[in-house]
């Protein structure tokens, strides 16, 4: 499959052949498993103090007193202690740090999921179905010359994005930024933000600084590429801008 390489002005300058990884079959099941595995590895284990509610000297008063035979405070037999239903007692089934909360995925399946997610970025129908605005984009996938990696000013990247036809998708991401419902607003998750274009580069020479402030835009070096960036929310087909150097780096990885 051949694609055109575009300059920063949005004009085609050459034609290259995409690596074989872009021909990988579409596997949404593996992509979802890989994304969930990535999510669960960010969860922090939580548990309770094993001695919580047990730091009391108690005794069993026995039968024959017309009272429930529960553990009671030794110096005040009127008050129950230690048992789950008593004030200040232990929890019946507290969360434990030993609980296995990570979802696993096999190495070969994880690799195939990444390859399938990369190939999904070249599928026009999947990119459109994901909600991206791609009416003015010359081609999918969009490959740009390596000079993009050296742009470090936000104003410059804005003009480049307008010439490449992806600015409308960034505006869509900005419009879809909403205040979260519920108590998540108090817990560092105030806004729900839409995902816009992903920029994949061979090396960072300033582009991360230049593009990171645009709503919904992510920039990543191809060596650090992951399934969650290519398929946010386990929905493959993210609008992706590749530099020519990143494409050549993929060719080294996958042939």
UniProtKB/Swiss-Prot annotation:
Ribosomal protein recorded as keyword: yes
Cited Gene3D superfamilies: 3.40.1370.10
InterPro entries assigned: Ribosomal_uL4 (IPR002136), Ribosomal_uL4_dom_sf (IPR023574), Ribosomal_uL4_euk/arc_CS (IPR013000), Ribosomal_uL4_euk/arch (IPR045240), Ribosomall_uL4-arc (IPR019970)
Name of a matching Pfam family: Ribosomal_L4
Domain of life: Archaea
Cellular component terms per the entry's GO annotation: ribonucleoprotein complex; ribosome
Swiss-Prot/TrEMBL keywords: Ribonucleoprotein, Ribosomal protein, RNA-binding, rRNA-binding
GO MF terms held by the record: rRNA binding; structural constituent of ribosome
Binding partners and assembly: Part of the 50S ribosomal subunit.
Protein function: One of the primary rRNA binding proteins, this protein initially binds near the 5'-end of the 23S rRNA. It is important during the early stages of 50S assembly. It makes multiple contacts with different domains of the 23S rRNA in the assembled 50S subunit and ribosome. Forms part of the polypeptide exit tunnel.
Name of the protein this chain belongs to: Large ribosomal subunit protein uL4
Species name: Thermococcus sibiricus (strain DSM 12597 / MM 739)
Gene: rpl4
């Amino acid at each position: 499959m051949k694609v055109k390489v575009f300059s920063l002005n949005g004009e085609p300058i050459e034609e290259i052949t995409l690596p074989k990884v872009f021909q990988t079959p579409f596997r949404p099941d593996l992509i979802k498993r890989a994304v969930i595995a990535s999510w669960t590895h960010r969860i922090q284990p939580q548990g309770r103090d094993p001695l919580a509610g047990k730091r009391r000297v108690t005794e069993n008063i026995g039968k024959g007193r017309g009272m429930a035979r529960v553990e009671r405070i030794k110096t005040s037999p009127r008050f129950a202690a230690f048992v789950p239903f008593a004030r200040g007692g232990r929890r019946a089934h507290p969360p434990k740090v030993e609980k296995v909360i990570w979802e696993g995925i096999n190495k070969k399946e994880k690799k195939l999921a990444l390859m399938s997610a990369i190939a999904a970025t070249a599928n026009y129908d999947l990119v459109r179905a994901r909600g991206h605005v791609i009416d003015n984009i010359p081609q999918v996938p969009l490959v740009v010359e390596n000079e993009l990696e050296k742009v470090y000013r936000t104003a410059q990247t804005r003009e480049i994005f307008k010439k490449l036809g992806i600015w409308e998708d960034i505006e869509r991401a900005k419009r879809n930024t909403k205040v979260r419902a519920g108590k998540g607003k108090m817990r560092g998750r105030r806004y729900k933000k839409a995902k816009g274009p992903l920029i994949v580069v061979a090396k960072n020479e300033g582009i991360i600084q230049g593009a990171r402030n645009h709503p919904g835009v992510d920039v990543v070096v191809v060596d650090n590429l992951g399934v969650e960036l290519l398929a946010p929310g386990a929905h493959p087909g993210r609008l992706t801008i590749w530099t020519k150097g990143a494409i050549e780096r993929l060719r080294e990885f996958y042939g």
